[in-house]
Amino acid sequence: MADTVAGVRTFAVLLPLTVIGQMITAVMRVDEKVQIQANLMTVSAIIAICWLALSTFVLKFGVMGAGVYYGLSIGIWAIGIFWFIGGKKSQLQISPADLKLDFAICGQIFKIGFPFFLVQGATFIFNTVANSLLGSLGGDMGSLYIAAFGVINGYILYITMMVAQCFSYGLQPIAAFNAGAKAWARLKETLSCTLKYQVVTLALVTVALWLAATPVCAFFAGSDPALVEVAANATRTVILAVALGYLAMTMSMYFQAVEKVGVATFTGLLRYVICSVPLMYLLGNMMGVEGVWIALVVADAITGIISIALAAHESKRLATL
């Protein structure tokens, strides 16, 4: 417990840097300095991984070393702030006058960013419900199913989510720029291309993960054969429709960019809460643990269909402008 507390406190010290780092990289995307952002993130990842290996295997720092690792992996991004201070490297220069709070701007930031905040809360609800159902429906094997969900949600689905984020984070600044410039044809083309390439890419990733489910789960789950078997079997079910499910995240990011907060909030909650939670309860009580896994597939499919419908409606709207 003391080791864990030390790790949490260490990360808390570095938390301000991680917040600044996330903000800076987001602004870099808007400023179209994607290569600089990518270089900064790559360097931070290399440094953080090297530190994790050193602190774990050589220095034996335990959880405290992991706290520093998490802080470094994102906190180093904060160095990017110097891109916006002094000189003419960017049009978005920060001056002392900008440090004064403008509550009107703060309100606008809160309004546009609120959907993303709700998505984070939605994932908490989603994880809580899934763990609770797997534990209760799994009986004596409940802890094994919870561990399997941890592997799937923490690693397998995280991999697919990172792929989806590449598209959604790339779409957002371009969509915001084109919307501001009233370049509706470019905005429509950008949205269409992003969704098409995202579905195709995630479909290929899904096939790869489905075929390699056992070795991938073994890599993350360790040497427990029972856990690997349960996680691999569940993975082959859960990932079947993620190529559709993550369309909601991209559409939410798009609607945030064009300042349609209501629809952005709806699509942000669609996969994790609106579809997944009721279906997990319904199919879980009907089919047991297998019903929970199947519920995630059905939720992804429904989420994808709704997202495609919203994208089609938005494309028609843009065509009339």
How would you label these PLM feature ranges?
Residues T10-V30, Q37-A48, A66-F82, S168, ...:
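Short runs within selected transmembrane alpha-helices of multi-pass transporters and secretion channels
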Residues A26, A53, F116, P173, ...:
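Small-residue-mediated transmembrane helix hinge/kink sites in multi-pass secondary transporters
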Residues L14-T18, K111-F177, Q198-V205, T235-M249, ...:
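Transmembrane helix-bundle signature of multi-pass secondary active exporters and lipid flippases
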Residues M1-L14, L54-F114, A175-A241, L282-L321:
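Short alpha-helical transmembrane segments in multi-pass integral membrane proteins
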Residues G21-Q37, I146-A213, Y246-T267:
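Small-residue-rich hydrophobic transmembrane alpha-helices
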